[in-house]
Amino acid sequence: MTKDYDDDFYRPPMPTVAGLMFPARSKLTVRGFTLAKTPAEKYWRQIISASQAERETCLLTLAMPNLWNLFEQPEPVSFVDVDGKQRTHRFDYLAEFKDRSRVAIAVKPEARVYSLNFRQTLQAIKRDLPMGFADRVVLVTERERHPVEVRNAELLNFFRRRTDRDADLIVRDIIKQLSAEGTIAELVDKSGLGARAFRAVFRAIYDERLSANKRETITRNSIVSPRKDKK
């Protein structure tokens, strides 16, 4: 009989924790969501995005090995703009990392950054950030989002949906025995687990147990090498 604490027991994803909700029908936003389970949380949760650019940024952030938690649309912050006027700004994401640092993330198209002189505005926002809100402020435009890296991050998020601890441990043992670079196919064949091993190797790359070029599509033919510091 399936227990409610079994891994196979279905649980609907937790709702978004966004501080701002966008209307389902809007000419200004294209609302979507990403299912994610961060190290800080026990269950999968919806992370809302107002644009494809935000969704891509979300996926790339979730793929960071040192990420602890990710919040979308956190509470707005007040600042004095370059004209001396009091204004508020709501960041798109607030990321918490395992070293306890916090990074506020603004996502904007490069053209809008230029037309709004947003980099100067962001400096004013950074200057007036409330104590403890964030240690750093970053701006993400399409220049920072490599399309192949985004696709790899999306595949990683998909592979994380179904945990496979046995495959992860077997692949981890194989990695410990590696002394030189090789293909993912070689690791998969050595494991005898087929697609399960491919998914485990993929996860191991983003756990920084293996090095690989994430700006190339990760396939069975991809070259990987062991990371000595993670063995």
Where are these regions (language model features)?
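Electrostatic, structured charged patches in enzyme active sites and in nucleic-acid/phosphate-binding
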Residues: 1-231
